[in-house]
Amino acid sequence: GEKTISCPIMNANGEVLGLIQKNASEESTESYAIGAGYGASLSISALSMNDGSLNKIGIKKALPDTEDQALVFLYMSSEQLDKDSYLILINDFLAQYPNSPEGYIRLANYYLASGDASQYALADENMKKALDVATQKDEAHYQVAKTIYSYMISLEEGQEAYKEWSYEKALELIRKAVQSSAQPIHIQLEGDILFAQGNYADAFEAYNKVNQTSFASAATFYSASKAKQLTEGSNMNEVLALMDSAIVKLSKPYFGEAAPYFYERAELRAQAGKFREAVMDYNTFFEAVSGDVTALFYFQREQAEMQCRMYQQALNDINKAVEMAPEDVDFLVEKGSVHLRVNQLDEAIATFQKAISMNDQYAAAYRMLGYCQALQNKNKEACANFAKAKELGDTVVDQLIEKYCK
């Protein structure tokens, strides 16, 4: 009956065999017991945070039995617990594993994530503690350097850093890690810190070392390409070759995560005068993001298409840009210039007039409108527009005045 539910069943020696359970059927007269061994077999694992039954009972969970499992449990919990519960869990972890540098790094990151400058002293204290207790100093130096670097890149422009936290401090720590074990992941962070400092030549050297290891990936070649591009006196072909290497590392079919690589290479190819190849990369980018692009994308692709005389595609793209951003006068003027280029003078004139109605200080619009009118032998209107362009500071219009208005 009801009164016996959860009562123990024992054998003749007084050993508990199981606990009586309620029958799922109200009518049944049979009872069942859950074996005592079941309770003994219950344990908390790294994935217990996702266990629906354990979450329902609302009782605080113990940490898993090993430090590695407990660290995974901490990681899983960081996504699911509220801030206060997570703090209690980290402190429980440190009570159980007081010599775990990862625990102190977690606590430091917790205080940093609060965004409350008054908590930064606690973050600093925990980073120092991590370095103190670590037996693998290289890993601790890497973790603390990474934490300081992440903090530094999150600062707003002009915002002052906390006490001695700086890129220099992060660099000093990561170089200690690199000195004792030059792991690619350490050298990668060294490159990231140098890049953030604007030391692009040394950042490139670091990324280049990583790219000669099995750790090389699309991301590391991308970083090397950017660092090379920003290094003074760099060769554009070398920059492009590195971006090619990044793209070779991507797996097909290309999805969203591949998109930035193709966008970047499209821009590099356009800068190098390889416009047809640039258009191909813009097209791959477009497919990778399933056509979810901005007006600026259509404008940029149109620029490359114009350079390789793909006029119909260019016209389609600039029309799309204008449709998506009708308030952007630059796009409108570009649309007018495409019409002009393919000798659609009436469409060009209407477009430039619309641009001027939106911004009557746009010198280039007056110049190009005047040029269309000159081509239609309407020199009086043309010269009036050239004069307006000159008045507004246009520097190219003098040649047109010389040709049509003398």
Name every feature range the model reports, one short phrase each:
Residues 19-88:
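C-terminal cap/linker of serine protease catalytic domains
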Residues 2-19:
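Catalytic nucleophile loop of clan PA
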